[in-house]
Regions:
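Residues that define the transmembrane beta-barrel architecture of outer-membrane proteins
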Residues: 24, 53-57, 120-126, 140, ...
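Extracellular/periplasm-exposed beta-strand and loop segments of Gram-negative cell-envelope proteins
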Residues: 36-54, 82-122, 153-200, 232-244
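Start-of-domain marker
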Residues: 22-72
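Bacterial Sec-dependent N-terminal signal peptides
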Residues: 1-29, 251-257
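Predominantly the C-terminal beta-signal and adjacent terminal strand-loop region
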Residues: 177-182, 197-198, 202, 207-257
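Acidic/histidine-enriched, beta-strand-rich ligand/metal-binding domains
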Residues: 74, 80, 120-122, 132-141, ...
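Outer-membrane beta-barrel channels and translocator barrels
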Residues: 21, 68, 135-139, 214-218, ...
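Residues on the lipid-exposed face of transmembrane beta-strands in outer-membrane beta-barrel proteins
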Residues: 28-32, 57-65, 77-79, 126-132, ...
């Protein structure tokens, strides 16, 4: 009988709690992104391998509909930086040096060198996430959230720096020669737009956790999360098989509308 009364009380009170908590909230956030270009674990393509993390800005607008104090749906419109850097061993297309290669000389498809290479990407992303919130005290709540996202590439730059000798083998034992003489060091320092080489659309999963502090109609939060892209970045798989992903750390606020 006691259990029955508890159930009746919950059934009677719950709708009022839901009504009190439900509604639209809007906000904004900003912070840093720590992305890395991922390559398959089985990859033997040196275009894909060896990228390390970089740091860039990220910011977004938030729209959240709260069904009750525990569950909500959250959508965002984010400016997200992605990319990576690789220093040291690099693979180079032989066609980039065709002016130095005498007619009739057969060379491998790729040449090799040592310099620095950085890929900088900017996406506009639209995630839709389920969010679960748990009270820690009267003012603080812990939230976890996750769901799919779609992204659109708006900027892509490749930046190289450094000088290197050019080799015809990955072990770097044989230098590229022109008229019988080694070509010597070549300056690779340059920046170029590479957006036409990449797929503009992307999709994947995004999620994270946050600590929220409520004061009046405004909630302040600190969030740590990340995203994991599913689509290959390069249009031509011969030039790599990387996917996006990384960590995001942000501060923000939302307010009840």
């Amino acid at each position: 009988m006691r259990i029955l009364w508890v159930v009746v009380c919950v059934v009677l009170i719950f709708p009022f709690c839901v009504q009190a908590q439900r509604g639209w909230h809007a906000g904004l956030k900003g912070g840093i992104s720590v992305p890395k270009l991922r390559a398959p674990s089985s990859s033997t393509n040196s275009y894909s391998d060896g990228f390390q993390t970089v740091v860039g800005p990220q910011a977004g607008l938030i729209a959240e509909y709260r069904f009750n104090s525990l569950f909500s749906l959250q959508s965002e419109f984010n400016y997200s930086t992605q990319g990576g850097e690789k220093n040291g061993d690099q693979r180079i297309r032989t066609t980039d040096f065709k002016a130095y290669i005498p007619v009739g000389v057969n060379l491998p498809q790729y040449l090799y060198g040592n310099f620095n290479n950085k890929i900088s990407l900017v996406y506009l992303e639209l995630p839709l996430m389920a969010k679960f919130s748990f009270p820690l005290s009267n003012k603080y709540r812990l939230a976890v959230y996750g769901g799919p996202y779609a992204g659109y590439l708006i900027k892509a730059e490749g930046e190289a720096s450094g000088k290197s000798k050019i080799y015809t083998d990955p072990q770097k034992t044989t230098e590229l020669k022109y008229n019988g003489f080694a070509l010597g060091e070549v300056d690779f320092t340059r920046k170029e737009d590479i957006i036409d080489q990449l797929s503009k659309n992307n999709f994947g999963l995004q999620g994270g956790t946050s600590i929220e502090y409520a004061t009046g109609r405004i909630n302040y939060f600190f969030a740590v999360g990340g995203n994991y892209g599913f689509k290959r970045l390069q249009k031509d798989p011969n030039f790599g098989n990387n996917k996006t992903g990384g960590l995001a750390i942000s501060l923000g606020l939302t307010t009840k509308l």
